[in-house]
C-alpha cells in the first residue's frame, strides 16, 4: 500500500514536470489558434466559422480538432476531426455542420440554415502532444429580419367641428426582428405617434407604432408613410387617409357685372364634401325665388332678361350623409354694363408714372444746366468787370478828400490826348477831370487864379467827404457831355490797406462810416 501511494505521488509529480517542460519549450508561445472574434448571420442563411493552427513545431503532434459551444457554463461538442477516426458531427448539428478542409492546421466549418438557437460562443480546440491543448473562441450572433407592414384603422374617420379627441388612423408593425427595428412616420399631418416593443420567447422583438390625430377636412387624401430602419435595410409603406366631412359650399357665376336686359346668366352651387353632396336647395333671404329664376339641382337659372327684381342674396344648401352646410352670394343689378379697361390700357397706365418721372428728371437736368451756365457767365463777368462810376448805387466821394479817394492813385498822364480839332494844349485838372481853363471859362473868365494854387471850387469840394446821390446826379448832368482826361483799368490799382474793393467796382474805406 505504501508503495502504491509513493508510486501515485511520483506519477503526479512526473506529469507536472512534463507539463512545465512543455510550457517552457522553445516556440510554445508561438502556437496560436486563429479564429474570427465575432460573426453574424441571418436566420435561414449559412455562416462559415474559420479556425486554423499557426506555426506548429516540428516535434509537436496534433491529435484532434474539436468545435464546441459554450452553454450555461459548460461545453457541448459540435463537431470533431480525428486523423485516425475521421469526422464526427453531433446532434442537433449533424445535418447542418461540415468541415471544409479538415487537416492538422485547418479546422474551418460551415454552419447552414442558421437558427436563433445557434447564437452563442463557439470554441475551436487543437489537441497537441506533448504541448497540450490550444483553443480560441468566437461569438456568433444570429439576426432575424423583421416583417413590416402598415394598416389603416377600420373605423370611419369623420371631421366634426367642436371635437378635439384624437383617434387612431394607422398602425405600423415591425414583427419578429432581432435586434429590434427603428420605426418612424413620414407625413404632413399634425398628429402624434406612440411606440410599443414586445419581446418574443425566441429572442426576437416586435415593434408597434400607432398614429393618432383629430380628423379634419384638410386631412382628407393626405399621405401617411411608415418608415422602418433595420440594419442596412429601409422599409417604407404608405396609405392615404379617407376623412369624411360636411359640405363646404361656394357659389359661382356672379361676375359683378349683371345689368338690365342681360341674358343667359346663372349661379352654380359647388360643394366640397366627402362623401359628395347628394341634395341641393336654393333660397333667398326673403325665402322664395324671384319670378324668372329657376333652380335645377345645383344650378340656378335666370330666365329672360335681367331686371331689378332679380337682385338680392341667394343661398344654396348642400347635404351629404355627414351633414348640411350652406353658402350665399349677393347679386347686384346695374342699369348699364361695366366695361373694364383693356389689359393694354392698364399696362400703358402703369407706364405713365415712369414717363412723368423721366420728364421731371429731364427738366431738372435742363434747369441745372442753364443755372450752371448763368453762374459761369457771372463769374467770368466778375473777373473782367471794369467798374461803372455813373451808377446811383455809389456813395460818391468828392474826389479830393482822403476818405473819398484811394491813397495810391495812378499817376496823372503827362500828355493828354485831345481830339484832332483841338488847337490848344490843355492842362489836366485834378483827378483827370476838366482843365483849369475850362473851369475859368464857366465862371465867366473874369476871375483870377493864383498860379500853382488850387481852384476855389475844388478847394470847397475837397472839404466835403462825400456827395449825396442827388448831388452826384446833378454833377453828372453838368459833366455828362465831358470825357475824362484819361482812362485806366481799376484792376491795376494798388489799393491801400484801409480800402475795400466792392463787386460793382467802387471802393469803401474801412475807417469811416457811411450813412
Curated annotation (Swiss-Prot):
<keyword id="KW-1015">Disulfide bond</keyword>
<feature type="region of interest" description="Disordered">
    <location>
        <begin position="400"/>
        <end position="486"/>
    </location>
</feature>
<feature type="transmembrane region" description="Helical">
    <location>
        <begin position="356"/>
        <end position="376"/>
    </location>
</feature>
<keyword id="KW-0966">Cell projection</keyword>
<keyword id="KW-0325">Glycoprotein</keyword>
<feature type="compositionally biased region" description="Acidic residues">
    <location>
        <begin position="436"/>
        <end position="445"/>
    </location>
</feature>
<keyword id="KW-0597">Phosphoprotein</keyword>
<keyword id="KW-0675">Receptor</keyword>
<feature type="domain" description="Ig-like V-type">
    <location>
        <begin position="31"/>
        <end position="141"/>
    </location>
</feature>
<dbReference type="GO" id="GO:0046598">
    <property type="term" value="P:positive regulation of viral entry into host cell"/>
</dbReference>
<feature type="domain" description="Ig-like C2-type 1">
    <location>
        <begin position="145"/>
        <end position="243"/>
    </location>
</feature>
<comment type="function">
    <text>(Microbial infection) Acts as a receptor for herpes simplex virus 1/HHV-1, herpes simplex virus 2/HHV-2, and pseudorabies virus/PRV.</text>
</comment>
<keyword id="KW-0393">Immunoglobulin domain</keyword>
<feature type="modified residue" description="Phosphoserine">
    <location>
        <position position="422"/>
    </location>
</feature>
<dbReference type="GO" id="GO:1902414">
    <property type="term" value="P:protein localization to cell junction"/>
</dbReference>
<dbReference type="GO" id="GO:0001618">
    <property type="term" value="F:virus receptor activity"/>
</dbReference>
<feature type="disulfide bond">
    <location>
        <begin position="172"/>
        <end position="226"/>
    </location>
</feature>
<keyword id="KW-0472">Membrane</keyword>
<dbReference type="InterPro" id="IPR013783">
    <property type="entry name" value="Ig-like_fold"/>
</dbReference>
<keyword id="KW-0677">Repeat</keyword>
<feature type="signal peptide">
    <location>
        <begin position="1"/>
        <end position="30"/>
    </location>
</feature>
<feature type="glycosylation site" description="N-linked (GlcNAc...) asparagine">
    <location>
        <position position="36"/>
    </location>
</feature>
<feature type="topological domain" description="Extracellular">
    <location>
        <begin position="31"/>
        <end position="355"/>
    </location>
</feature>
<dbReference type="Pfam" id="PF08205">
    <property type="entry name" value="C2-set_2"/>
</dbReference>
<feature type="modified residue" description="Phosphotyrosine">
    <location>
        <position position="436"/>
    </location>
</feature>
<dbReference type="GO" id="GO:0005886">
    <property type="term" value="C:plasma membrane"/>
</dbReference>
<keyword id="KW-0770">Synapse</keyword>
<feature type="modified residue" description="Phosphoserine">
    <location>
        <position position="435"/>
    </location>
</feature>
<dbReference type="Pfam" id="PF07686">
    <property type="entry name" value="V-set"/>
</dbReference>
<dbReference type="InterPro" id="IPR041849">
    <property type="entry name" value="Nectin-1_IgV1"/>
</dbReference>
<keyword id="KW-0732">Signal</keyword>
<keyword id="KW-1003">Cell membrane</keyword>
<feature type="glycosylation site" description="N-linked (GlcNAc...) asparagine">
    <location>
        <position position="307"/>
    </location>
</feature>
<feature type="glycosylation site" description="N-linked (GlcNAc...) asparagine">
    <location>
        <position position="332"/>
    </location>
</feature>
<comment type="similarity">
    <text>Belongs to the nectin family.</text>
</comment>
<comment type="subunit">
    <text>(Microbial infection) Interacts with herpes pseudorabies virus/PRV envelope glycoprotein D.</text>
</comment>
<dbReference type="GO" id="GO:0007156">
    <property type="term" value="P:homophilic cell adhesion via plasma membrane adhesion molecules"/>
</dbReference>
<dbReference type="InterPro" id="IPR051427">
    <property type="entry name" value="Nectin/Nectin-like"/>
</dbReference>
<dbReference type="GO" id="GO:0005912">
    <property type="term" value="C:adherens junction"/>
</dbReference>
<dbReference type="Pfam" id="PF13927">
    <property type="entry name" value="Ig_3"/>
</dbReference>
<feature type="disulfide bond">
    <location>
        <begin position="51"/>
        <end position="124"/>
    </location>
</feature>
<dbReference type="GO" id="GO:0042995">
    <property type="term" value="C:cell projection"/>
</dbReference>
